[in-house]
């Protein structure tokens, strides 16, 4: 890499550190000619698909819009920033792994809803109400009833999971998700 100060074509890396989220590497460099030091950030460059909007228009994926969607849905909700970041990364990962050059906006919306459903049910219903254009209280009620029935099914499956684990000689799982003695 060339030197930002003297334009010499050779610099050497004197220190490298991975960021906390593991997505970037900060490199400290020194110019072989003038001795000046500077830092660079190295990130992975992966193309995200172009988003096909409902009106047929196309636009580049915008991570800020994704962030805004999560922020609005989870406004004043007790969800840790770290979990929101993980959910956003999960959406981006799903889009990348789809391997498509273009993705309809509805796919992005469904990915966001899937992650919000795991994070916070109130945030999920908020997002769904806008995304699916709820018209009245009945639409909210219907979505909440779907959520409740899914929670009931997963609660009913826990005893089946415990029984299966015990039959295989594994300790059971209590309601808190911890292994029993």
From Swiss-Prot:
GO terms for molecular function: ATP binding; DNA binding; zinc ion binding. Coiled coil: none annotated. The keyword Ligase does not apply. Its cofactor is Zn(2+). A zinc finger (unnamed) spans 3-34. Binds 1 zinc ion. GO terms for biological process: negative regulation of DNA-templated transcription. Residues 49-139 form the ATP-cone domain. Keywords: ATP-binding, DNA-binding, Metal-binding, Nucleotide-binding, Repressor, Transcription, Transcription regulation, Zinc, Zinc-finger. InterPro entries: ATP-cone_dom, NrdR-like_N, RNR_NrdR-like. The keyword Isomerase does not apply. Belongs to the NrdR family. Negatively regulates transcription of bacterial ribonucleotide reductase nrd genes and operons by binding to NrdR-boxes. This is Transcriptional repressor NrdR. It comes from Xylella fastidiosa (strain M12).
């Amino acid at each position: 890499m060339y030197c930002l100060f003297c334009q010499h074509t050779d610099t050497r890396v004197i220190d490298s550190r991975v960021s906390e989220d593991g997505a970037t590497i900060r490199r400290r460099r020194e110019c072989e000619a003038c001795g000046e030091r500077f830092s660079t950030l190295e990130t992975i460059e992966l193309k995200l698909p172009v988003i096909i909007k409902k009106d047929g228009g196309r636009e580049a994926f915008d991570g800020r819009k994704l962030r805004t969607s999560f922020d609005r849905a989870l406004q004043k909700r007790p969800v840790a920033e770290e979990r929101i970041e993980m959910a956003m990364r999960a959406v981006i990962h799903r889009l990348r792994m789809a391997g498509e050059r273009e993705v309809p906006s509805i796919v992005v919306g469904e990915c966001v809803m899937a992650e919000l459903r795991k994070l916070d049910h109130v945030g999920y219903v908020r997002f769904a109400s806008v995304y699916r254009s709820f018209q009245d209280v009945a639409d909210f009620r219907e979505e909440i009833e779907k959520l409740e029935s899914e929670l009931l099914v997963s609660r009913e499956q826990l005893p089946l999971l415990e029984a299966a684990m015990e039959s295989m000689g594994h300790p059971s799982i209590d309601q808190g998700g911890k292994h029993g003695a």
